[in-house]
């Protein structure tokens, strides 16, 4: 089990390029480090988070390339004060380029409100070990149902 202040890894952790890339991605997000996060992704990477049309991607086509991925960060990640990733299982394919992580992300905002998202994240890496595709399967309505308003002072 890997544990940091923001990442709890309860899943198998055999060496695997896609699994390692996913862990680097979680770490950069937890630190709020956009530049580090961008180094995890290939220049032409696509992020679909969540898969399909959503408040982050009305057409459901994903965020493509550096500009698209940076825009996704500003829209979906930057407003969050803290992240806690808990990965409960991870399935990796034998050829080493894909893994699917099953877990939960708890997010907190500066005002004290928070959400919990149960999800499956699928990472595909290129020959350089950088993420070429990341698809996160989760339901925005379920996340919003978990929203807890900050206490009123």
Regions found by a protein language model. Give the residues of each.
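Short, low-complexity N-terminal intrinsically disordered segments enriched in polar/charged residues
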Residues: 1-39, 43, 151-153
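Short beta-strand edge/turn micro-motifs at domain boundaries
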Residues: 2, 118-146
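A solvent-exposed, acidic/Ser-Thr-rich amphipathic alpha-helical stretch
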Residues: 17, 36, 42-94
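Hydrophobic pocket/interface hotspot
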Residues: 25, 37, 45, 65, ...
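Short, acidic, Ser/Thr-enriched surface-loop or helix-capping motifs
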Residues: 42, 109, 125-126
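Short, cysteine-centered beta-strand-loop-beta hairpins and adjacent loop/turn segments enriched
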Residues: 79-81, 106-116
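Short, surface-exposed coil-to-beta transition loops
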Residues: 84-86, 102, 115-121
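A short hydrophobic beta-strand element
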Residues: 94-105
């Amino acid at each position: 089990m890997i544990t940091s202040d923001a990442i709890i890894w309860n899943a198998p952790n055999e060496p695997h390029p896609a699994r390692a890339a996913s862990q680097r991605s979680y770490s950069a997000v937890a630190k709020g480090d956009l530049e580090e996060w961008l180094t995890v992704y290939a220049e032409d990477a696509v992020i679909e988070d969540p898969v399909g049309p959503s408040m982050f991607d009305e057409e459901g086509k994903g965020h493509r390339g550096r500009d698209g991925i940076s825009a996704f960060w500003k829209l979906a990640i930057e407003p969050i004060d803290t992240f806690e990733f808990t990965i409960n299982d991870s399935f990796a394919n034998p050829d080493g380029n894909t893994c699917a992580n099953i877990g939960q992300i708890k997010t907190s905002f500066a005002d004290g409100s928070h959400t919990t998202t149960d999800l499956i994240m699928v990472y595909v890496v290129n020959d350089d070990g950088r993420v070429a595709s990341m698809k996160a399967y989760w339901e925005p309505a379920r996340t919003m149902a978990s929203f807890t308003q900050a206490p009123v002072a």
